[in-house]
């Protein structure tokens, strides 16, 4: 018998990287599966890296219907009263540690591309927008070199208002809720906290909470830097080719607009 050792070569290691944050009651592996069609359309242009949230939770109902055997399930934020209370500074530290861990793990695999974007679904999209806002505030107060990140854009799939505060020491005049609070109820704006880093928002027109997604788009993101994709779907990641193509096109446009390498 002839034995051969076939080494699989990862041809995305040099590509610019997009950090991906799953929804609440899900996990990194599930979100990667949900994004498979988007990855397929962009795999020669970006490397997608999927982070795992720090806190355990029950599965979100839509997740349970398809991925019930894919646990354990995790969350970034509290959305139920029975989720254990936590100090804001401890929640922020746990979230940041998760993100830095997955970055280090990807570096260890040999990846070298710049971290150019954030992509999130549902609670993960709220987190992405909040991370971008923290970066924006830090860049304004400390300068770009001391912001801790340099993401050029965000892709927010079914992300709902409001943003949450991820650096209370800098958000002294902010009306944002802190990261330890339950923030899924309708936010009563308008908000003085406006994200100007470019974003594309993806809204399913049959999503029961699309009004909250519109609120994030309209009240928390600057008109000159936001884009919108609407598709005929509910609370999930688009999978049909034409729907995914619209999202992929806007990601390419954002990358070009922001000079992402």
From Swiss-Prot:
GO terms for biological process: secondary metabolite biosynthetic process. The active site is at residues 122, 207, 235. GO terms for molecular function: hydrolase activity. Induction: Expression is stimulated under green light conditions. Transmembrane segments: none annotated. Keywords: Hydrolase. GO terms for cellular component: cytoplasm; nucleus. Pathway: Mycotoxin biosynthesis. Its EC number is 3.1.2.-. The keyword Nucleotide-binding does not apply. SUPFAM superfamilies: alpha/beta-Hydrolases (SSF53474). It is an enzyme of class 3 (hydrolase). InterPro entries: AB_hydrolase_fold, FSH-like_dom, LovG. Pfam families: FSH1. Disruption phenotype: Leads to a significant reduction (over 95%), but not abolition, of citrinin biosynthesis. The keyword Nucleotide-binding does not apply. Non-reducing polyketide synthase; part of the gene cluster that mediates the biosynthesis of the mycotoxin citrinin, a hepato-nephrotoxic compound to humans due to inhibition of respiration complex III. The pathway begins with the synthesis of a keto-aldehyde intermediate by the citrinin PKS (pksCT also named citS) from successive condensations of 4 malonyl-CoA units, presumably with a simple acetyl-CoA starter unit. Release of the keto-aldehyde intermediate is consistent with the presence of the C-terminal reductive release domain. Belongs to the LovG family. This is Esterase citA. It comes from Monascus ruber. The lineage of its organism: Eukaryota, Fungi, Dikarya, Ascomycota, Pezizomycotina.
């Amino acid at each position: 018998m002839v034995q051969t050792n076939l080494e699989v070569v990862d041809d995305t290691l040099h590509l610019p990287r997009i950090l991906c944050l799953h929804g609440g009651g899900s996990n990194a592996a599930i979100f990667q599966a949900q994004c498979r069609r988007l990855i397929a359309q962009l795999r020669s242009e970006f490397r997608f890296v999927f982070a795992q949230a720090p806190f355990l939770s029950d599965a979100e109902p839509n997740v349970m219907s398809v991925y019930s055997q894919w646990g354990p399930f995790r969350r970034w934020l509290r959305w139920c009263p029975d989720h254990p209370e936590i100090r804001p500074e401890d929640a922020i530290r746990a979230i940041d540690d998760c993100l830095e861990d997955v970055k280090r793990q990807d570096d260890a695999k040999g990846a070298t591309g710049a971290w150019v974007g954030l992509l999130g679904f549902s609670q993960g999209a709220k987190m992405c927008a909040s991370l971008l806002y923290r970066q924006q505030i830090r860049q304004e107060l400390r300068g770009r070199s001391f912001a801790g990140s340099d993401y050029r854009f965000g892709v927010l799939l079914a992300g709902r208002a409001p943003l949450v505060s991820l650096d209370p020491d800098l958000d002294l005049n902010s009306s944002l809720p802190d990261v330890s609070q339950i923030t899924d109820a309708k936010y009563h704006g308008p908000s003085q906290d406006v994200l100007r880093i470019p974003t594309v928002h993806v809204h399913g027109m049959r999503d029961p909470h699309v009004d909250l997604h519109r609120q994030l788009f309209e009240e928390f993101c600057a008109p000159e830097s936001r884009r919108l994709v609407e598709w005929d779907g509910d609370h999930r990641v688009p999978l049909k080719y034409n729907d995914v193509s619209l999202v992929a096109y806007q990601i390419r446009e954002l990358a070009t607009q922001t000079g992402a390498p």
